[in-house]
Design a protein with these regions (language model features):
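Flexible, processing/modification-adjacent segments and terminal tails
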Residues: 20-41, 45-50, 56-58, 87, ...
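Beta-strand elements of well-folded, non-transmembrane domains
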Residues: 50-52, 67-71, 147, 160-162
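Short beta-strand-initiation
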Residues: 60, 69, 76, 151-153, ...
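An acidic-aromatic
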Residues: 62-110, 178-179
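Gly/Pro-enriched, hydrophobic low-complexity segments
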Residues: 125-128, 134-204, 209-211
Length: 212
């Protein structure tokens, strides 16, 4: 689960920090950014696959991400990560425990709310052809970090008509390839503050591990 969540936040960091040299890529990301800022909430259902040919690993799972401002709730792989903008609760279903941490705003540990909000010079991006992409409305952007990161590159796929992220591939230094595909994208979904806070009453007998 840590890998899943880290990869999603890396995607956020890529888009946030993606100062690009390709004019076409710049324009497209600017348009997606502007569109994203108009949403009060975003709910995305997604599937993800981790592949490592050398280690003969090929695992697939699914999840749901709900975002509202600095707050988010991610459910995937038997775990739920909840953040109210300051505190992060990681609920482990199998062991019936919740780990409590302060939100880390350093480096790539960024909140999904920072998606598409500003740019700097941490990435070089270029429009590329993705052989696996058959959607005529989709555009693929290769992003290579200019500073040291725990991944080599990412390929972001964007719907150039709807101005929405369709998915991305993340290639790390261990030979792992993480592929994420958005299967359902909803905007301005009704939500309340309780969606982004941990309620122990919903998890009878849960063990609380405060790591702050």
């Amino acid at each position: 689960m840590k890998t899943v969540f880290t990869s999603i936040l890396v995607l956020a960091a890529i888009i946030v920090n993606g100062q690009v040299k390709d004019a076409k890529a710049t324009a497209l990301l600017d348009e997606v950014s502007a569109k994203t800022k108009t949403y009060k909430t975003i709910k995305a259902d997604f599937t993800y696959t981790m592949e490592n040919k050398q280690a003969k690993i090929n695992e697939s799972k699914s999840g749901v991400l709900l975002v509202s401002g600095d707050k988010y709730k991610l459910t995937a792989a038997g775990q739920t990560v909840i953040c109210d903008g300051k505190t992060v609760w990681t609920v482990l279903k199998e062991s019936n425990e919740v780990q409590v941490n302060n939100l880390d705003n350093k480096d790539d540990a960024m909140t999904p709310s920072k998606l598409l909000t500003s740019y700097n010079q941490n990435y070089k991006a270029t429009i590329v052809r993705d052989k696996g992409n058959t959607d005529p409305n989709a555009e693929s952007i290769e992003l290579i970090p200019n500073v040291q990161k725990n991944f080599i590159k990412a390929i972001l796929t964007v719907d150039k008509v709807k101005k929405q992220v369709k998915g991305f591939k993340l290639f790390d230094k261990s030979g792992n390839i993480f592929t994420y595909k958005v299967t359902k994208f909803q905007t301005d979904v009704p939500s309340t503050a309780s969606d982004f806070t941990f309620d122990a009453a919903k998890y009878p007998g849960v063990e609380v591990i405060d790591m702050r």
